[in-house]
């Protein structure tokens, strides 16, 4: 806020000063500088009784753009903005500097006044006497322009970010709508087959062997879980990454949980003739984690491993009691791997490698995995598979015995 001595002046009502000597005093709210500012103001007030000059007092906390405009590094600071050249006094001895410079400033003022008198006959095209360009009002306008420019820049960035988020959500929703058709159709066919062959009078399936009934039920359940994951992904996109991730940790057998997820994905990796190798020790301790959240992590990592491993390739799963406090779980594949430069970025929300733009997926799986693992005070990272491909590792706390 600009102040004329002790009088407050509104930003939208700037002062138009014609005083030959114009000064700005920059102050802040620090208690340590309060006494120094009072001494400077008292000295300037004494000078005003004898000399004609305009003094504006500026609080840098309320007008940071003016401080930026003058490139100030310390306060209090006294600036002579008119007549030119501009001079800045700062430090603990402002009054001493002012006493030394005041005669020169008055000499400059006398020269300026004499020059103005000589220019009275020189007018501009509108019949007005030319005014000095470096005035208190022009400084306030410059500071306001700096502030508005900053705001416009920030608003443009926010707009671009929001547009990017909206475009991403539109793309994900369109992909989900398309992808939901396959599991919905498969589940519907399985259920309709079971329904059309079920005789409620005898409580049995006709013309269907027990093994086929079990297979159809498994297929319907698997497709329902696929749909559930897609809906969870859609909800995650809608919520964004700024919402708090709620977890309900409990004693969890991560090895057993992983085998359950593998069973749900069996049709996918057997269709590609992929081999699954597991190295999960029987004495691997339970972890303290939210089983549904960790299921999401396992589904995402195994889904990626199946997706990127070629037909006939190998998917590896390993558990390791890394320390007395942590269990490490790892999932490896024999796919194309992750370039070294991208191993941090792949965990960013919406980020996808250029080579994967044509593949199915929404660019939120690994980001969600990282959020879940971090919510459990664990770590997740990726490195190279010695035989080609990638290894994803994550840690979880051991359940206290």
Curated annotation (Swiss-Prot):
Recorded name of the encoding gene: sasA
Catalytic activity: ATP + protein L-histidine = ADP + protein N-phospho-L-histidine
Domain description: The N-terminus interacts with KaiC, while the C-terminal histidine kinase domain autophosphorylates and is probably responsible for self-oligomerization. The N-terminal domain stimulates the C-terminus to autophosphorylate.
Subunit description: Homooligomerizes. Interacts with KaiC. Participates in the KaiABC clock complex, whose core is composed of a KaiC homohexamer, 6 KaiB and up to 6 KaiA dimers. SasA and KaiB(fs) compete to bind to KaiC.
Protein name as annotated: Adaptive-response sensory kinase SasA
Its biological purpose: Member of the two-component regulatory system SasA/RpaA involved in genome-wide circadian gene expression. One of several clock output pathways. Participates in the Kai clock protein complex, the main circadian regulator in cyanobacteria, via its interaction with KaiC. KaiC enhances the autophosphorylation activity of SasA, which then transfers its phosphate group to RpaA to activate it. In addition to its output function, recruits fold-shifted KaiB (KaiB(fs)) to KaiC to cooperatively form the KaiB(6):KaiC(6) complex (independent of SasA kinase activity).
Disulfide bonds, paired cysteine numbers: none
Modified residues (Phosphohistidine): 178
EC number from the UniProt entry: 2.7.13.3
Ranges of residues in domain Histidine kinase: 175-400
CDD domains recorded: HATPase (cd00075), HisKA (cd00082), KaiB_like (cd02978)
Gene3D superfamilies linked: 1.10.287.130, Glutaredoxin, Histidine kinase-like ATPase, C-terminal domain
Lineage top rank: taxon: Bacteria
One biological process term in Gene Ontology: circadian rhythm
Keywords, sorted A to Z: ATP-binding, Biological rhythms, Kinase, Nucleotide-binding, Phosphoprotein, Transferase, Two-component regulatory system
GO-annotated molecular function: ATP binding; phosphorelay sensor kinase activity
Classification via InterPro entries: HATPase_C_sf, His_kinase_dom, HisK_dim/P_dom, HisK_dim/P_sf, KaiB_domain, Kinase_SasA, Sensor_HK_Regulatory, Sig_transdc_His_kin-like_C
Family matches, as SMART domains: HATPase_c (SM00387), HisKA (SM00388), KaiB (SM01248)
């Amino acid at each position: 806020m600009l102040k004329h001595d002790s009088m407050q002046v509104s930003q939208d009502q700037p002062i138009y000063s014609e005083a030959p000597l114009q000064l700005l005093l920059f102050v802040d709210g620090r208690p340590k500088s309060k006494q120094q500012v009072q001494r400077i103001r008292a000295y300037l007030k004494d000078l005003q009784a004898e000399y004609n000059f305009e003094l504006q007092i500026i609080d840098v906390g309320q007008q940071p753009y003016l401080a930026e405009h003058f490139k100030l590094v310390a306060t209090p600071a006294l600036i002579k903005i008119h007549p030119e050249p501009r001079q800045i006094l700062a430090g603990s001895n402002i009054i001493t500097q002012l006493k030394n410079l005041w005669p020169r400033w008055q000499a400059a003022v006398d020269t300026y006044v004499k020059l103005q008198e000589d220019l009275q006959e020189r007018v501009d095209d509108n019949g007005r006497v030319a005014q000095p360009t470096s005035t208190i009002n022009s400084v306030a306008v410059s500071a306001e322009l700096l502030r508005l420019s900053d705001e416009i820049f920030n608003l443009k960035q926010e707009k671009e970010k929001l547009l990017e988020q909206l475009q991403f959500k539109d793309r994900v929703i369109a992909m989900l709508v398309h992808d939901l058709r396959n599991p919905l159709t498969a589940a519907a066919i399985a259920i309709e087959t079971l329904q059309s062959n079920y005789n409620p009078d005898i409580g049995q399936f006709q013309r269907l062997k027990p093994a086929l009934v079990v297979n159809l039920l498994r297929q319907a359940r698997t497709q329902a879980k696929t749909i559930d994951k897609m809906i969870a992904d859609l909800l995650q996109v809608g919520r964004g990454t700024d919402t708090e991730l709620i977890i309900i940790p409990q004693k969890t057998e991560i090895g057993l949980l992983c085998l359950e997820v593998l069973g749900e994905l069996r049709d996918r990796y057997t269709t590609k003739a992929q081999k699954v190798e597991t190295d999960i020790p029987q004495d691997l301790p339970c972890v303290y984690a939210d089983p549904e959240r960790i299921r999401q992590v396992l589904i995402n990592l195994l889904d990626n491993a199946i997706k990127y491993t070629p037909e006939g390739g190998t998917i590896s799963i390993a558990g390791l009691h890394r320390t007395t406090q942590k269990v490490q779980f790892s999932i490896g594949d024999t796919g194309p791997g992750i370039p070294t430069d991208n191993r941090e970025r792949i965990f960013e929300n919406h980020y996808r490698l250029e080579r994967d733009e044509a593949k199915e997926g929404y660019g939120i799986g690994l980001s969600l995995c990282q959020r879940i693992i971090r919510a459990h005070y664990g770590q997740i990272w990726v490195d190279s598979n010695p035989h080609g491909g990638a290894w994803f590792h994550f840690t979880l706390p051991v359940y206290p015995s």
